[in-house]
Swiss-Prot record:
Keyword Nuclease: no
Gene source species: Eremothecium gossypii (strain ATCC 10895 / CBS 109.51 / FGSC 9923 / NRRL Y-1056)
Protein's UniProt name: Mitochondrial import protein 1
GO cellular component, one term: mitochondrial outer membrane
Highest rank taxon of the organism: Eukaryota
Length: 155
């Protein structure tokens, strides 16, 4: 195990030297270099990670993968900006919607199940029109019952 690690150190140093020498050449030519694995199963052999210069790629299968930097905004950069804008602008909007609907739902449930005493809690007077009409009808019904009951409270 130790021999393999020590043997790989020399190979890694050699690969780093080749990569730095290749980086200077790509800076001058303007081409982009990408790492390519030697095999799909991850066995890299004695060469480590190989680099290929995309400006010298001539095969028909890889010519479509030629990536060159041009003036303007790249599609990846545009997606990155759109993603950060959606996080900063869209998610707070959705959060506000969820909070608002949650508050409306809690209010409706408390009204439906009479969780709070309506006689004691008179400070909160914001109701939809339908509920205002229902409350007025309930008051009229209570007044009619109290008038019919008489002064002593019995029928």
């Amino acid at each position: 195990m130790a021999e393999e690690i020590l043997g790989n150190i020399a190979e890694e140093a050699h690969a780093a030297l080749l990569a730095s020498a290749g980086d200077e050449a790509t800076k001058k030519s303007g081409a982009i270099r990408l790492p390519i694995e030697d095999s799909l199963d991850g066995d890299f052999g004695s060469r480590g990670t190989a680099y290929t210069d995309l400006s010298t790629t001539t095969s028909a299968g890889t010519s479509g993968q030629l990536v060159e930097r041009t003036g303007g905004i790249s599609f990846g950069r545009l997606l990155s900006v759109a993603g950060s804008c959606s996080i900063n602008l869209l998610l707070p909007f959705l959060n506000g919607l969820m909070l608002g609907f949650g508050e409306l739902l809690a209010h409706e449930l408390s009204w439906k199940f009479s969780w709070f005493d309506k006689e004691r809690n008179r400070g909160y007077r914001i109701y939809p029109e339908v509920r205002k009409a229902a409350e007025l009808q309930e008051r009229e019904r209570q007044r009619a019952l109290s008038r019919a009951a008489g002064p002593d409270g019995f029928l």
